[in-house]
Swiss-Prot record:
Protein name (database record): Mitochondrial translation factor ATP22
Source species taxonomy: Eukaryota, Fungi, Dikarya, Ascomycota, Saccharomycotina
Subcellular location: Mitochondrion inner membrane
Function field: Translation factor specific for subunit 6 of the mitochondrial ATPase. Required for assembly of the CF(0) component of the ATPase.
Similarity comment: family membership: Belongs to the ATP22 family.
Species per Swiss-Prot/TrEMBL record: Vanderwaltozyma polyspora (strain ATCC 22028 / DSM 70294 / BCRC 21397 / CBS 2163 / NBRC 10782 / NRRL Y-8283 / UCD 57-17)
Transmembrane portions of the chain: none
This protein's encoding gene: ATP22
Amino acid sequence: MIRFVQIHGLQLVRHNSTISTISGKIQNDIRLMIDQKTPRAFLKQNSNSTKELVKILDVVDKPDEIKPIKRLLMKKFKQNYSPFINKLRDASENPTKLHLTYIKQIGQEYRVLFNKYIDEIISNNEIDTIDKKNCIYEMINLQNELYPTIGEKYGWFLTDKIHKWFWENIDKNESFTHYYFLIQNNVNLSSSYHILQFQKRLLKGSQLEFELASFQLFLHKPEYEHIFRRKFIILNSFDSIRSFVNLLIQKNDLRFLRMYFNSMLDSMKRPSFKTNPDTVEFDSRLNLIYFNISLLNYLSKIEDIKMFSSTLRILANETSKIQTNELNKDNKIRLSNISNLLLSPLSSSITLLRNKGMYDEAFDLLSLMRKTPMVHNSVFKNFLIGHLISCLRSFNDPKLSLQYVTSAYRRKRVALFLNQLGLWGWVYHGKSYTLSNQELDTEYQKIKNTLPRSMVSIQYPPLPVLTELYITVLNTFSKTMDKENFKVFLLDLYQRYKKTILPMRSHNLYFQQNTGILNAFLKHVRYSINDHLLSLTILKDFYNESDSHRFKPTDGTSPFSIVVYQNEKLSNRDISKVLELMDSLEIPLDFKFCVAMVYHYHSRNNIPEALVWYKKILDSKFNVEHMGLIKLITENGWEYPDHFDMKLLENLDEQKQSSTEEEDFLISNTKEDLETEAPTEATTDSEMIIKEFQAMISNTNHVLKKPLLD
C-alpha cells in the first residue's frame, strides 16, 4: 500500500510495508487457533500447530495487522512468550524477520538482529537493487510502526554499511524522497559518514532540498511545526544542528533562528550516542563553547557589538577554564578547531569596530582573546596580531606599528628582514637607509619586549600582517610628505620590496604570496601621486620578474583592476598588453576588472565593446550593486542581471561617487586588508531575538552540572 503526504505544497510518496493484502478475518482465525489449544501444544518439538500458525504470520506484513496479533499472542503465552517466539522463528521461512516483528522487548539483541537482517538483504545477489531498496524500506517502516515510542524518544540508528548502500544505489534525484522517508520513520540523520553525505548533498542542492535537510521545511506552516519540535533534536546531533544554524546565518536567513538556538540548547542536554565516558565533561564544555560561537556569528551578522562583547566574555571564561595540559591529542585538536571557527565572527566584529572608529572596544576584544588557550594556535595568534596592527593604523604612527610587529615576531631575523625591506630605515630614520647589524641590534633590543610572551610568534610576519604594516607606513607618509618626495619614498620602498621578497625560497612567505602589498603601492601611485601611467609601469615591471607568477590576486581586488579602473591615461594598446599579461599568468577576470573595462570603452564611446564586457559580468553571475555601473546599464538600456535588486534604481539620482568612493570600491573587501563585507539587513526582529538570547546566555552554564577541568 502507498500513501501520499502533502507537505509545503509537495506531494511525497510514503512507503508502507505491504506485499499482500490480508483480510481482517486473519485476526479471528488466529484467535480461534490459539484458543482451541494450550500453550504447551505450540511449544512441543516439531509442533504442527506452530507450523500452521507460522504460515499465517509469515504473510502478515501490515503493521496495523501485526500489532493486535502480537498483543493477542503476548496475552495468551505470558511468561512463555519468548520460548514461543523461538519456536515460531525455528519454523519460519523468514526467521530473522519474524523474530524482529514479534520480539517482546527492544534491546541490544534486537539492534544486532535488525542490522544483520538488512545486511543479509544487501548481500543477497538474487534480489535486484529496486527490490532490495523496497525490502529495506519495508523493515525500517515496520520497526517504526511497531515500536513508535522507541523511535520518537530515541530515533533509530542504522549502520554505516546500510547508509553506504543507500548512497551508492539511490539515484541522486531521489535523495530528497529518501531523506524524507528517513525523517518519517525516525531514522537518525547524524550517526554515520554516509548519512551525513546525504545531508551535505541536500544542503548544497535546491532551496527545497536545503530546507528539508535543515528541517526548515516544517516551519513554514503552523500545522507542520510539530514535526520540527518532535523530531529535530532526536534525529540530528548537536554538531548537525550547529552547522544548520551557521549556514542559515551565512545565508542571512534569520526567520526561525530562535527555534534553532533553542534546539541547540536542548540538544546539549541530551546524551550523545557518540559520548565517550572519559571525555564527557570536556565534550559538554566544548558544546557550550560551540553554542556561543554560533551566537557570536549571529551577533556579528546583525552588528550588535554590545551583546557580542558580552557573549565573547562568556566564551573566553569557558575556554580559560580548560586545562590544555590535561587534554589528550584528539581533544587538543578539537580545541584548536574552535580557534578557527571563531576567526570569522571575531574578524567581522573587530573590522566593524575599526570602521566605526571604536578602537578602544576593538582593543578590549583582542585583549580578551589573548588570555584564552586559543592563543596557542598559531593561526589564531597571527589573526590577533594582524587585527592589532590593523587597529594601530588609527594612530597614524608607523613607529608604533613597526615596534609591535617586531615584538610580536620576536626573532632577530625578522628585524633583519624589515631592515632589508627598507621599512626600518624609513620609519625610524626618515630616509632610505640600511642599518649595520650592530646598529640594528642596539635598536632591536630596546623594543623587542613590547608585547607579552603569549602574543609572540616564532614565524616571519604573515602577509596580512606585513600588508597592514605597509598600508600604515604608506598612508602616513603620503600625508606628511609632498608629492615628489613621497614618489621617491614609494619607489625606493617598492624596489626594496621586490628585491627582498621575490627571491625568497627558505620560509613560509614563499608559499603564501599574494598581491596585498603590491595593491597598496599601486593605490598610492594612482590616488596619492596621481601618476596613472606609472601604475602600469610598476605592474609590468613586477610581473616581468622571474618569480612573480607566484603572486596571485586574492578574493578581493587584483592589481590589474587598480591599474585599469577609470584610468583615462591608458590607450587601447595598453589595455591589450594588460590582458595579454593576465592571460599569460592565468589570472581570471573579476568583477572589478570587468567594471573597469566597461568604463574604459564607454568613456571612449565604444558602446559595443563596453556591452561585450558587461555581458561578461552577466555570464559570470556577479552581484551588481555598483551604482556607477547601474547608471550606465540604465542609460544604455541594457538588460539588468538576474535577481537584480530594482530598489537600487530609486537611489540612482542621489548617487554621485567621489574619487574616495571609487578608491574604496577598488581596495575594500580584500583579504589582505582583513576586511569583511557588511551584512545585509536582518530579516527578523533582532531585538526580540537578542532578549531571548540574553536569557539563553544566562542559563547556558546550567547545562553543565559542575565546573569542568577547573
